[in-house]
Amino acid sequence: MSVSALSSTRFTGSISGFLQVASVLGLLLLLVKAVQFYLQRQWLLKAFQQFPSPPFHWFFGHKQFQGDKELQQIMTCVENFPSAFPRWFWGSKAYLIVYDPDYMKVILGRSDPKANGVYRLLAPWIGYGLLLLNGQPWFQHRRMLTPAFHYDILKPYVKNMADSIRLMLDKWEQLAGQDSSIEIFQHISLMTLDTVMKCAFSHNGSVQVDGNYKSYIQAIGNLNDLFHSRVRNIFHQNDTIYNFSSNGHLFNRACQLAHDHTDGVIKLRKDQLQNAGELEKVKKKRRLDFLDILLLARMENGDSLSDKDLRAEVDTFMFEGHDTTASGVSWIFYALATHPEHQQRCREEVQSVLGDGSSITWDHLDQIPYTTMCIKEALRLYPPVPGIVRELSTSVTFPDGRSLPKGIQVTLSIYGLHHNPKVWPNPEVFDPSRFAPDSPRHSHSFLPFSGGARNCIGKQFAMSEMKVIVALTLLRFELLPDPTKVPIPLPRLVLKSKNGIYLYLKKLH
């Protein structure tokens, strides 16, 4: 036999041997994964044995919850299963969906961490800021940032809010004469971003005029959808597989757009603080705004807040501070448009307090109680954040005696709670009197800003902004629904509409 033939035979044998070993290893890995799948599934089945649920596939879980009907399916379960039910995403992944105020009170009164399996998927986008942090790091960041939302800080923000809102309303004046309805969410999103930039990030100028910011708004919308898709895809839980997928490429590109925006905001303010006069002026303030707190905390102690931590907090508040408020306001406007009698009563109340609206102050916001009731009722029907997830750090027993072991992930369905007929009679009816001062309700029946120690740090900022937006808008426009474009709510990180939120604008003067 020739040397070349012998070498070829050895090479072929080596390849064959390698393939055999690879096949054996592959089968072993598959077997290990199958055993892990089985054991995890059995553990979950045992953990949830006290909680009935709709029928589900052994591998695909509750497939009927996918798509546009997800909220409708959840509401069917709210009516049929008391307090909570397990939702299976696939054979070895399930959450207990909770929509009972007593259950909510128990979970929110504990110190369970955010569910890592879900929220870690957000880390490439918003980093580990207040939303994702747990334990002592979360406590330290929360304590550091709480002063940014003190009443003394928020009061002068009303002027900034009003300036941003009037700019949007001026744009709407040009559109009001058209025969077609307009999609309001994009306009409102730019306006709330403008407000956050002015109030929390010391930004001069207007986001609504600069067309460059539209790409950031679009990126945030894409990230919402991509995150939602990834949570529901078993294969995309693996970072490597996801990063090589088309959705992974889109997600990373959108993250880069969002990061470019926040990096620019941080750099601009850091450059301004290099000016000794500006720095001294800021340090003399009795209370600092959000970004200055972050920057000065780092400047006074270089180890206290890293660049990574700094950007995580900016990314988190930039998203939460504008997108959730934009969602809330858009749905509030839709609710008022579809209930003109309540819209008119709000308008009359605002007119009695503000006149023509040329001036609005913090003190005015407590003088529009009926408008506030309507805002809260709209937030009940359309909660900006439809759900949050916790992972049990210890076992828990609920008031009805049912229990869960450590490690189970619990989804607090704010949407389900707010539409639960056992909590809110006739839950689909828009009834602002539910929030009258003398109207009794459970302490955990209304949670648009979550509850407990980890409630939304900016809830007072958001409520104040929504009051200013609604008041000034109703003085200039009548809001009318477009019956040909009824919005379809979708449960993303923030409650969105599949087909936008379209309204007709009728100029009043």
Curated annotation (Swiss-Prot):
Domain of life assignment: Eukaryota
Annotated tissue distribution: Expressed in liver (at protein level) and kidney (at protein level).
Cofactor(s) the protein requires to work: heme
A Pfam family this chain is assigned to: p450
Catalysed reaction equations from the record: an omega-methyl-long-chain fatty acid + reduced [NADPH--hemoprotein reductase] + O2 = an omega-hydroxy-long-chain fatty acid + oxidized [NADPH--hemoprotein reductase] + H2O + H(+); dodecanoate + reduced [NADPH--hemoprotein reductase] + O2 = 12-hydroxydodecanoate + oxidized [NADPH--hemoprotein reductase] + H2O + H(+); dodecanoate + reduced [NADPH--hemoprotein reductase] + O2 = 11-hydroxydodecanoate + oxidized [NADPH--hemoprotein reductase] + H2O + H(+); tetradecanoate + reduced [NADPH--hemoprotein reductase] + O2 = 14-hydroxytetradecanoate + oxidized [NADPH--hemoprotein reductase] + H2O + H(+)
Segments traversing the membrane: 11-31, 121-141
Location of Phosphoserine modifications: 439
GO BP, one annotated term: lauric acid metabolic process
Molecular functions (GO terms): 16-hydroxypalmitate dehydrogenase activity; alkane 1-monooxygenase activity; arachidonate monooxygenase activity; heme binding; iron ion binding; long-chain fatty acid omega-hydroxylase activity; medium-chain fatty acid omega-hydroxylase activity
Compartments, record wording: Endoplasmic reticulum membrane; Microsome membrane
Sequence positions that bind heme: 320, 456
Keywords from the named record: Endoplasmic reticulum, Fatty acid metabolism, Heme, Iron, Lipid metabolism, Membrane, Metal-binding, Microsome, Monooxygenase, NADP, Oxidoreductase, Phosphoprotein, Transmembrane, Transmembrane helix
Its membrane topology: Multi-pass membrane protein
Inducing factors: By clofibrate.
An annotated GO cellular component: endoplasmic reticulum membrane
Disulfide pairings: none
SUPFAM superfamilies for the chain: Cytochrome P450
EC number per UniProt: 1.14.14.80
Family the UniProt entry places it in: Belongs to the cytochrome P450 family.
The name this protein goes by in its record: Cytochrome P450 4A10
Organism classification: Eukaryota, Metazoa, Chordata, Craniata, Vertebrata
